[in-house]
Amino acid sequence: MRLAIILLLMTTIVLTIGSPLHGAKCSSSNQCTRPCRYGGGTHGKCMNGRCRCYG
């Protein structure tokens, strides 16, 4: 039981930390709210309410 709780916590932490790497949330005007640095890309494209990076 304890292992399941630890795995759940780790997954939550990874998702929370990992989400900004894949791009910030998009603004109401469908623009990225912050520059994209993941994968060497400096620009982002909004997809499903999230910013996707491209070089």
UniProtKB/Swiss-Prot annotation:
Tell me the leader sequence span.
1-18
Q: Other comments? A: Negative results: does not block voltage-gated sodium channels Nav1.4/SCN4A, Nav1.5/SCN5A, and Nav1.7/SCN9A.
Q: Name one Pfam family in it.
A: Toxin_2
Expression across tissues: Expressed by the venom gland.
Q: What family does the entry list?
A: Belongs to the short scorpion toxin superfamily. Potassium channel inhibitor family. Alpha-KTx 12 subfamily.
Grouped into one coarse class, the protein's main location is: secreted
- Has UniProt tagged this entry with the keyword Transferase? no
* Gene Ontology molecular function: ion channel inhibitor activity; potassium channel regulator activity; toxin activity
One Gene Ontology cellular component term attached to this UniProt record is: extracellular region
Q: What is this protein called?
A: Potassium channel toxin alpha-KTX 12 Sp2
Looking at the UniProt entry, the stretches that span the membrane are: none
Q: What is known of its domains?
A: Has the structural arrangement of an alpha-helix connected to a beta-sheet by disulfide bonds (CSalpha/beta).
**Subcellular location, record wording:** Secreted
The entry's function note states:
Blocks mouse voltage-gated potassium channels Kv1.3/KCNA3 (IC(50)=0.3-30 nM), when the channel is expressed in Jurkat T cells or in HEK293 cells. Also shows a weaker inhibition on mKv1.2/KCNA2 (IC(50)=56.9 nM) and mKv1.1/KCNA1 (IC(50)=485 nM). Probably through the inhibition of both Kv1.2/KCNA2 and Kv1.3/KCNA3, the toxin also reduces the free calcium concentration in Jurkat T cells, inhibits the activation of Jurkat T cells and reduces the release of inflammatory cytokines interleukin-2, showing a strong immunosuppressant effect.
Matching InterPro entries, A to Z? Scorpion_toxin-like_sf (IPR036574), Scorpion_toxinS_K_inh (IPR001947)
Which superkingdom? Answer: Eukaryota
Question: Which cystines does this chain contain?
Answer: C26-C46, C32-C51, C36-C53
Q: Which UniProt keywords apply?
A: Disulfide bond, Ion channel impairing toxin, Neurotoxin, Potassium channel impairing toxin, Secreted, Signal, Toxin, Voltage-gated potassium channel impairing toxin
